[in-house]
Amino acid sequence: MRQVSSEEAFNTKLYPPMILGSILNPINSSMLAVALIPIAQAFGIPFYQTIWLVSSLYLATSIGQPVIGKLIDIFGPRGLFLFATSLVGVASLIAIFTPSFYGLVLARFLIGIGTCAGYPSAMYLISYEGKRTGKDSPSKILTMLSISNQMISVIGPTIGGLLIHSGGWQSIFLVNIPLSILSFVFGFLYYPKVESPKKLNALKEQIDFIGITLFTITLTTWMIFFMEPDQSIFYLFIIGLFCLLVFVIVELKSKKPFIDLRVLGHNGALNNTYIRSLLTAVISYSVLYGYVQWLEEGRGLTAAHAGLMMLPQFLVGIFMAQLTGTRLSIKFKLYLGTICALITMIGFQFIHADTPLWILVLLAAIFGVPQGLLNLANQNALYHQAPKSMIGMSAGLSRTAMYIGAIVSSTLISTLFKGDHITNGIHELGLFCMLIGIVIIILTFVSRRSLSTR
């Protein structure tokens, strides 16, 4: 059998920094799920207010992902990856030692910025290695990235619960420090130095600062309004709507837009993938934060026990990702995953404070199927549909869509879980997610021809 030379094969030394960088976001998302109640108790605030810790990270990432993705397309991934992973470690130290809740919110925002480079860097390097080797078959590394992300996303609550049980809520931030150091070291050693003709003094020509500002104002004002909806702050909704309209006009006229609406307008399949990614995220994060909070507050479990209850979801998710990674078509993954998500949401309609634990474990296990399939399917679709010259920005926009979905989810949870009726809240959250699941199936059917690949 002919030996494959190093020039023909994907550089496997890139695997550790690519995987470590990509898991920084899911580990900071998933472990927090079981920490919200302990943090609320520690700072003496209502538990629904801790959703700001969720929203602040996703506000940062929804803005930072496309910006850093574009910077990576221009300057290469190495410097940005090293800076971003260092920021995660520094921000985690702030989180551990801050005396105030809003200091913790700020730390989460900085952590969000720090996690923005991992995924666009990985997608850039996959494309870079494809050009270097002359091969364009990234299914193996894409599956590895998806499995590692799914593994962390689902095992995170279990690890977080055990850490909180032994060392308090601060311990979930302590984990970031060795991860940050390892990511920096591996990135420094193995990420290639990509020559770029661009100079820093041309940055203002490459980055749409006006578009970024308008996008930020829109997200921030709407997030504040919908998390605490009240007639007295309705003006925030109007400001957000106005900024959104101006944003669309500016982006259509800009030579280097923050979000290239013209490209999106001519790539219906990619648009469909972005919308599916957003809707998938609403369901996934509703389970991650809503279901776990209900297990603690509505079912009376400890953080450690609530985390352990999510372990079956991890096992099923990893199994499904490995089983179907290179076997099933993208559309079949989407259909199967969404149907299982709908079954879970139907189950949510019947859970109460005295529901047997085995039923709650079963619901978590069933949701492992969409957890293992949906993000993998959308990730594969993105790689095949995005222009190769814009893979970094396209990957960043995909993550932005997911993080906007997370913001929508956290806003829903904050609204529905207020007061003493958290069980009613989980029922209503399930109904909302059922409607979203139906929309995902419709979108998949509409784009079925472009989703026939693996």
Model regions and ranges:
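12-transmembrane solute porter fold
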Residues: 10-27, 32-36, 47, 53-56, ...
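Extracellular/periplasmic helix-loop-helix junction of adjacent transmembrane segments
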Residues: 35-64, 103
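Structural signal for membrane-spanning alpha-helices in multi-pass inner-membrane proteins
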Residues: 95, 187, 222-223, 247-251, ...
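Hydrophobic transmembrane-helix bundles of small-molecule transporters
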Residues: 143, 165-276, 283
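Short, Lys/Arg-rich, polar N-terminal cytosolic tail immediately upstream
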Residues: 1-8
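Helix-to-coil boundary motifs at intracellular loop junctions of multi-pass secondary transporters
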Residues: 42-43, 74, 125-134, 166, ...
